[in-house]
Amino acid sequence: MKLRRDIMLFITLAVVAAVGGVFLLLNRPGAAVDVFLSEAKARAAAARPNPANAESFRATVCAVGPCVLVEAGGLAVLVGAGEGSAEGLLARGLMRADLDAVVLPDLMLDSVVGLPGLAKASLAAGRRAPLKVHGPPGIVPVIDGANLMLAGEAGVRLSVGTDKEDQGLEGLLVFDSGVVTVRAFGGQVAGEGRVYRVDFEGKSLIIAGCRAKAAQIVSAARGAQTAAGILAAGSSRLEDNQDSCIPVADALQAAGQARLGAILMSPLRPSVAIPGALQAWRDVVAGERVAGAVAGGPGSVIDLSSGKPAIRLAN
């Protein structure tokens, strides 16, 4: 019994000493400065540029609104410019001075509000040429308005990208590097969004925003051998009177018809920025029972670099 008491006393004293040591360490003069500097170094390390290599084909959700950075063949194309896009890219080390283009799924405010911030952040990263922005008909006044907001910022400009050839069922060719192509499907009718398809080395990524139609998703995937998708969706189950975004059931049904091998649902309405919304969304998506479909927030990645598309969800 005495031995047991001695052991318990020793353990108690050790715990008290450890707790006391931590308390003294955190409350010593200058401790707050050390903590701040340590956290600042961690933030700087996370924001350090981390571009994908030339063989990679990946897409990263960069904000709670429309913002997906696609990196393929050493090139980078941003789909959507929602609120917080620049901050999201910077925080993940994905802001690039050599961003090849921004392509807008639609011209609604939530898809374009981040354009001025992107222009300024890309300039700060070292960009010198105007940032090209592609989008549906009506994009010119949107870019003019964004440039007007940047009028006081020397050297910061956006320019309207010129789409290439309309290839009928194969979509509108928006961007072609000779290795990577970006095609748009739909978006010719007022209020309708574009669905984009990015192709690299026989693999395809379909990206659909809130204003997309199910038929556009199916059309965009036509002829693809290995395909995955990042699809926006809304849920009237989670938000009353939600009618501004393609219903999750419709988006997933289209993804099934398109035979997408992996499906990342993002951005979503209601927004995953709302506490508890992301887990609720994961339950909703799981309830649709579509193989390979998951809901993810900012930082989630879909990777097509290897043989089979893979999704990595952010913590």
Give residue spans per PLM region.
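Sec-exported extracytoplasmic/periplasmic mature domains
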Residues: 120-124, 148-151, 256-257
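Acidic/polar short surface loop at catalytic or gating sites that assists cofactor/ion binding
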Residues: 32-33, 136-167
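Active-site neighborhood of phospho(di)ester-bond hydrolases with catalytic His/Asp-centered motifs
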Residues: 78-82, 99-111, 134-136, 205-211, ...
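Solvent-exposed, acidic/flexible segments
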Residues: 78-79, 92, 107-112, 136, ...
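Active-site metal-binding motif and surrounding structural segment of the metallo-beta-lactamase
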Residues: 83-134, 162, 222-230
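Cap/insert and terminal regions of metallo-dependent hydrolase folds
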Residues: 2-23, 211-300
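Core dinuclear metal-dependent hydrolase active-site scaffold
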Residues: 3-10, 17-95, 162-222, 298-315
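Extracytoplasmic/secreted envelope proteins and their assembly/folding machinery
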Residues: 86, 96, 115, 119, ...
